[in-house]
Amino acid sequence: MEIYGFTLSEVGRFTDLKFQLAPTPTHTSNVTVFVGNNGAGKTTLLKSLATSLSWLVARIRTEKGSGNHLAAEEIQNGASSALMVITVFDDSQAWSSIPDADPDDDLFTWGIARTRQGRKSTVHSSLTDVSRLAEHYRKELTADDKASLPLIAYYPVERSVLEIPLKIKTKHTFDQLDGYDNSLNRGVDFRRFFEWFREREDSENETGISDTALAEISIKFGYDSDVWKTLSNLKASSRDRQLTAVRSAIAAFMPGFTNLRVQRKPRLHMAIDKDGVTLNVAQLSQGEKSMMALVGDIARRLAMMNQSLDNPLHGDGIVLIDEVDLHLHPKWQRSLIRQLGETFPNCQFVLTTHSPLVISDAKDVLVYVLNDGELHEHNGLYGLDANQVLLEVMDTDIRNSDVQKRLNALLERLQDGDLETAQKLFAELAEELPDGHIELAKAALLLRKLELRRA
């Protein structure tokens, strides 16, 4: 399942906006990224996509389910009505395998409309196709209670890593449909993640050997003993497939982090090994917890919704993430899109970012620059350094504007052969800028050449 196209009419800043999402004929990646200044409308786009998709989730759950509605405050100022229309491509239907089938049979289009009170309606909601698509998945689930469902999730900028609970007061079920719980309105929920993880691990330990027991055996007999090797192999064979998916996803995004687990001594908590050192998850940095919670939540939902797949991370889905670079170290920002595609290869990702590192290190990513209510596709970003992306795509100076003006003035004086003024400007900048400043080092070479010519 993929979002094929989207239209916004009189919604927020957008009077009439139409766009496609990757993959497209010219962008084979499954990732689309929106960039733009604060207030440009990036969040409005993602929230509108989430609102449209909420109707599919609601009608997969129940035949007459209702999704989220357009709010009155989302209607553009001065307009009477607003409309959002989404087209989804889904080839999981039985007729998709028929040789002469119409390709349009795989496209489903529905619209959500809202009119201000006291105004005459000029647009109307249309929900026939979303009901038809949802009915297909309900039939699949009726015929096979292990049938896979598509993940649909939205992680807003307000997502936060909540306090990890020590006790679970009420138990929940975790079947395929539960993968949709709060998937479009809450973001990361460590409480539900902890509850799910503990339940799965309890089941895993009942059929295998706990990590605690294995650790005690290693202390007594050693890692090279036949006893430890036999029990370790037995544990590996009894690993829970869903937990394995979550652990492997976190390890892929966070090198050096392994063996996520629940520990019960000295008190109940989630633990993880970081570079061989066991830590309480609560001890991790905000960036580490944010990454773990985001990746863990996506993997958990995929695992729940694809129980019959050998690798649940290969499940189908659509994931929307606002400000995907939030709290992340630049090193993780640079590899983020590549890891999303490699770890979750059948999910379509729609992201927003303020980071040049996110969009300059992945091939075939579809990048839209948002400005004054309009979208402009920007190609050829792969391999550009962060400064080029800042200047060419994000319309931001690569350094302090005053410093840049003075560097430009220095280079102009050097080109004009004005040695005295150039020496003065260079001395002033050398006093303020750190040793090893690249542009100043280049200017120093040019200044030395000019001095030698004048000697």
Describe these PLM feature segments:
Residues 1-63, 259, 264-398:
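Switch/communication elements of ASCE P-loop NTPase nucleotide-binding domains
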Residues 1-205, 414, 434-455:
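P-loop NTPase switch/coupling surface
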Residues 2, 141-143, 338-342, 357-455:
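RecA-like P-loop NTPase motor core
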Residues 2, 87, 182-291, 296-314:
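Extended helical coiled-coil dimerization/tether regions that scaffold
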Residues 49, 53, 134-144, 246-254, ...:
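Hydrophobic, Leu/Ile/Phe/Ala-enriched alpha-helical segments that form helix-helix packing faces
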Residues 70-73, 108-111, 216-226, 269-275, ...:
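Amphipathic alpha-helical surface "interface" segments used
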Residues 130, 134, 148, 190, ...:
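A structural signal for well-ordered alpha-helical scaffolds and beta->alpha junctions
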